[in-house]
Each structure stands twice: as C-alpha cells, then as structure tokens.
Amino acid sequence: VLFYLAKLGLSLLILWLIFRSVDLGEVLRELAQIPVYIVLLVLAITMMRQYLQYRNWRYALKLNPWFCADEKQISRSYLIGIPLRFLLPGGHGSFAKVFFIDNSSKTASIAAVASEKLAQTWAILLFAAGSAFWVFPGWSPALKLMAFIVIALLPLILGGFTKWHRDLTVLRDGYRRNIPRMLIIQVIAVLLTMLQYYLLLNTMSAISFGETTLRMSIVQFSDTIPITISGLGLRESFAMHFLETAGYAGGKAITATLALFFIQDVLTCIPGLALLIIRKKD
C-alpha cells in the first residue's frame, strides 16, 4: 500500500509541476473540443489493440506445450490483468494475472508473463531507438546504430537462455514458434497507438503521421520507466518537451496524452475490475 501511495504521489507531483506552467483550463477546453467521431475512432482502435494484446497473452501461455486452459479462462485472466497494471510501476502489477489461470507449473506461468512483457517493451524500445536517429541528430550515429541493433536482437539473445536453463528447455520450441508472432503483433500495436496520437493531435494542429511516430515513439518510451502509475505525469512531461518544436504548446501536448490515457488505460480497466469484484464476492 505504501509503495502504491508513493508512486501515486510521484505521479501527482509531476502533474502538479506540469500544471504550474500550463493552463489547466486550456487543457480541459481542448479535451472538451475533441470531436465525438475522433473519440469513437480512438476507442475503436483501442479495442483493436486490446484484441491484439489478448492474442499475445494467448501466445505467451502457449509457449508451454502442456498448457491446456480454455479460452474463457485465458480471456478472463487477460481482462483482470489490465487493472492490475496500475498496482506497480511500469505495469508490472499485471504479472499477478498468472494467479487467475491454471498452468502446469509456476515456471511456465512466469515465463508466459515475462515473454509478454518482453514483447511489449521490445517494441517500444525499438521504435524509440529508431526515432532517435532523427530526434537526436547530435548523438553519435555509431552509438544509436549499436543501440538499435542490440534492441532488435534482444529477443534472439534472450531465447538463448532456453537452451541453458534446465527449467526453460521445455519452452524452447514454443518460444521459437510464438515469439516472432508476438513481436509482429506488438509492432502493429505500437503503430496503432501512433495512429491514435495522430488523430488526437490533428484535432488541434496539423502534423503528419511520420512526424507523430518519430516524436511520440520517444514519448512512449516513458512508459518503460517504472516510477509512476502507467507513465502518468512522466509521459506528459515528455510530450511537452518533444512536441513543442512541432508547434504544440504544453497544453495541447498534454491534451493528447491525457485523452489517450483515459480511453486506452482507464476505460479498458472496467471489465477487469468487474470480474475482480465478482470473484471477490464469490
């Protein structure tokens, strides 16, 4: 509880510092002026992303050749995992969803949730590393290229542990078969997020999809820094910095990130919270 309150306090502190330099009224007005059809489009894309993430969770569980839970249990554990993300920084609270699904071993369950998190983090880092070539022109090209190559090869490197660790050898074939699928799905998921930002940002000022992807890939990198609730506050400060030179004042940048946070993170928690409440009553 104290740990959760600490990260909640940090998120609120960062937001307070941000709103000291930004007109909160402007942000609220911008949020209210987002067209309904844009909100519905962003919500529809969120549903597509959630389906893709569900597929990834299913692939992750099936790394284990002896996994045999039914689809209902897989979907229930996935939905419950969405609100659990808020319990720990970096979304690591979602690891607790392994307690809501049957598996042949604890090792297989841990490997499933770890491989899912690996795919999610890998895609975010890959996009951020690729964007760095344009967003940070002053950085060493060799250093940026090295970082990009290491990140790109990271799943292959980690796959080597399935050969050397005795408890993971049974997962080797599943890793080779499913990890490529999971990585492709996560790349698509990141592109869908960029599309959502593109739609939201263009309600305030014109920006191309390519420019959106370059800048918001760096902003999304903040989600991997495990110090706040689902990146809240940290993401807004990144957005203010990296969108300013694209013509977005602080209030407009925050409008886009807060709108997507509410649609993509808060609204999607509702089914999982309902399942948790029902389970607690039972």
Predicted regions mapped to residue ranges:
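Predominantly cytoplasmic-facing regulatory/coupling regions of multi-pass membrane proteins
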Residues: 1-79, 131-227, 234, 242, ...
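Generic hydrophobic/packing signal
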Residues: 64, 87-91, 99-102, 126
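Membrane-interface segments at transmembrane-helix boundaries
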Residues: 64-75, 96-118
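Short intracellular "coupling" helices and adjacent cytoplasmic loop segments at the cytosolic face
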Residues: 79-96, 229
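Membrane-embedded alpha-helical segments of transport systems
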Residues: 80-88, 108-132, 258-271
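N-terminal low-complexity, intrinsically disordered patches enriched in charged
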Residues: 90, 102, 240-242, 281
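Conserved short cytoplasmic inter-helical helices of the MFS fold
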Residues: 91, 105-108, 252
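Transmembrane helix boundary and interhelical loop/hinge segments in multi-pass membrane proteins
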Residues: 91-97, 234-239
